[in-house]
């Protein structure tokens, strides 16, 4: 969206595929700060990943999927994909299908009851990576709870700050648990790239 870490209007409009989205999402991704570049600096490549887990399909979360298209699979909630493909024209613009084209996208459905909505998906069946529905911002918005072997966990709550009151209450309760190492929301300018070891 920002070639060489510099704001460029035409590149952003082309990337977003929509002039209206451009007016609401003028983001500058600094040089070497794209997801594939950050992980390459740590010696990790998308081809090494078992999965990319999508919190939802809004443009600011799905527009860079081609950067991680070599991952073994890209997972998104079945209802979220249905919402993006069959929702209103606004949904189809803000969740542009071109961003998913050419990726190994697969859908998942709930297999657990974690969270205020009682809907979750245990990615590997071992409780270590659990996608938790936190509806509000979008129908299929998910947080990711990452749990270490000692029970400590990190909660990545995506755009949960725009969720329903029940979802926000669940996020707050999780953040106050003794074993919660971090509760991280997207779009928080105080959060800097880094690594958390569990």
Tell what function each PLM region has.
Residues 67-70, 89-91, 197-198:
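Short, glycine/charged-enriched secondary-structure capping and boundary segments
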């Amino acid at each position: 969206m920002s070639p060489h870490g510099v704001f460029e209007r035409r590149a952003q409009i082309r990337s977003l595929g929509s002039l209206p989205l451009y007016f609401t999402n003028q983001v500058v991704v600094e040089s070497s700060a794209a997801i594939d570049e950050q992980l390459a600096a740590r010696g990790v490549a998308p081809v090494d990943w078992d999965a990319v887990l999508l919190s939802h399909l809004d443009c600011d979360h799905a527009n860079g999927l081609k950067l991680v298209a070599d991952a073994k699979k890209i997972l998104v909630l079945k209802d979220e994909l249905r919402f993006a493909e069959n929702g209103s024209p606004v949904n189809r613009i803000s969740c542009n299908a071109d961003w998913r084209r050419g990726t190994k996208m697969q859908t998942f459905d709930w297999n657990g009851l974690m969270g205020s909505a009682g809907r979750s998906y245990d990615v590997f069946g071992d409780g270590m990576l659990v996608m938790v529905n936190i509806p509000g911002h979008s129908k299929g918005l998910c947080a990711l709870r990452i749990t270490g072997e000692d029970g400590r966990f990190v909660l990545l709550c995506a755009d949960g700050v725009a969720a329903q009151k029940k979802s926000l209450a669940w996020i707050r309760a999780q953040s106050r648990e003794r074993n919660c190492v971090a509760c991280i929301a997207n779009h928080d300018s105080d959060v800097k790239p880094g690594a958390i070891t569990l």
